[in-house]
Amino acid sequence: MCAYETTMVGNLRTGAAMTAYMDHKDLANEVIAQARAQEITDGVHRVLDRIASAESAAGRAAGSVQLLAATKTRDVGEILAAIDAGIRVIGENRPQEITVKADGLAKRLGERGYSLGVIDAAEADTANAAAATHIPFHLIGQLQANKIGKVLPVVDTIESVDSIELAEKIARRATMRGITVGVLLEVNESGEESKSGCAPSHAIDLAQRIGAMGGLRLQGLMTIGAHVDDERTIRAGFAHLRRTRDQILASGAEGTADCTELSMGMTHDMAYAIEEGSTIVRVGTAIFGERAFI
């Protein structure tokens, strides 16, 4: 089954669950209890400490790894608490959640002196834009073609581009809007059928073709670690992604000079990923706790 077919099957299976989930939690809610805010603050600080320790153990410079808060199923109030605690990049899995949360987040962050993604770019004056601290907004989950128009006004970067067909559709929409969208090529390093991403053997060719597209800025590669207990297997996938990134950069192909990011590592395997060269770790559970919904 190709990546597109796999994605479509997954979307059909999760569509009803998504509707039911959003009926049970108000994702636009902006007010949370102080105790909950403290839990999130503590979670952010623990993860930042883990990242610092992993950087040191790997002999990497402090601050070389960005912490992206994966905010799937988290409401606006919970996300604001994470940002107040030090989060500076957020990532959503589902375009539907972006649509529900974006306006409230942008408004509340504006009151705090932040700008969110590209949501205010068209209206922000130069002085205010320069003064605001930018909070990048990434899409880290799968994107259907019919949802591209909904996420482009908000997200800076789409980390889940896994085919030329999807890249071309995003590029077309971006060009029509007169914008450039950051993208990461998602690579299925584990080979697990349940995961999206292009085959590792196709990654270099796809990256070079995407880099040459107008309206897109190829920023790097993304993968999800193997769902196994064997450390060597997990590390092997991360190390291979790093080598692939290095080959893309060394090729000197058009549009690949900025292909520097390696988005790999989550709550359970971030230390391995950092030691293997990750520049972005995507963490949800260790910050917010276990999800009550899928």
Q: What kind of region is each of these model predictions?
A:
Residues 5-6:
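Short terminal hydrophobic/aromatic SLiMs and anchors at protein ends
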